[in-house]
């Protein structure tokens, strides 16, 4: 039986997003970089304030408080306290989930609007 070689997943970076804005929208490279940076700064700042971020058709980012809890050192078995903390969670939209479930289908250009 033959085996199917799956392509190694790649990582999309902020620099690549800026390059895509430059190519597809016609912004100059400086403007494209500034837009990408500002977009992520606004998301980061909102989450730092404890606000949720909803990106329609993509998903929701939320800040959640995790209470303190007992943990265990795996080497010694000793119980150690884990401090309370805030974490960011992401819940993908149904639209994003269905696109991800079809990894080989090209994205619908209309859904990018």
From Swiss-Prot:
GO terms for biological process: DNA recombination; positive regulation of metabolic process; regulation of DNA-templated transcription; regulation of translation. This protein is one of the two subunits of integration host factor, a specific DNA-binding protein that functions in genetic recombination as well as in transcriptional and translational control. One of its GO terms (molecular function) is structural constituent of chromatin. PANTHER family: DNA-BINDING PROTEIN HU (PTHR33175), INTEGRATION HOST FACTOR SUBUNIT ALPHA (PTHR33175:SF2). Belongs to the bacterial histone-like protein family. It comes from the Bacteria. GO terms for cellular component: cytosol. Residues 59-80, 94-113 are annotated as: Disordered. InterPro entries: Hist_DNA-bd, Histone-like_DNA-bd_CS, IHF-like_DNA-bd_dom_sf, IHF_alpha. The lineage of its organism: Bacteria, Pseudomonadati, Pseudomonadota, Betaproteobacteria, Burkholderiales. Residues 104-113 have a biased composition (Pro residues). Pfam families: Bac_DNA_binding (PF00216). This is Integration host factor subunit alpha. Heterodimer of an alpha and a beta chain. Keywords: DNA recombination, DNA-binding, Transcription, Transcription regulation, Translation regulation. NCBIfam families: himA, PRK00285.1. It comes from Bordetella pertussis (strain Tohama I / ATCC BAA-589 / NCTC 13251).
């Amino acid at each position: 039986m033959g085996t199917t070689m799956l392509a190694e997943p790649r990582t999309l970076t902020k620099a690549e997003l800026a390059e895509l804005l430059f190519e597809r929208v016609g912004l100059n490279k400086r403007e494209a970089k500034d837009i990408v940076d500002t977009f992520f700064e606004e998301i980061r700042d909102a989450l730092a304030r404890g606000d949720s971020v909803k990106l329609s058709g993509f998903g929701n980012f939320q800040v959640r408080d995790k209470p303190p809890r007992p943990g265990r050192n795996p080497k010694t078995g000793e119980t150690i306290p884990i401090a309370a903390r805030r974490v960011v969670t992401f819940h993908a939209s149904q639209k994003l989930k269905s696109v991800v479930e079809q990894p080989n289908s090209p994205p619908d250009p209309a859904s990018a609007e």
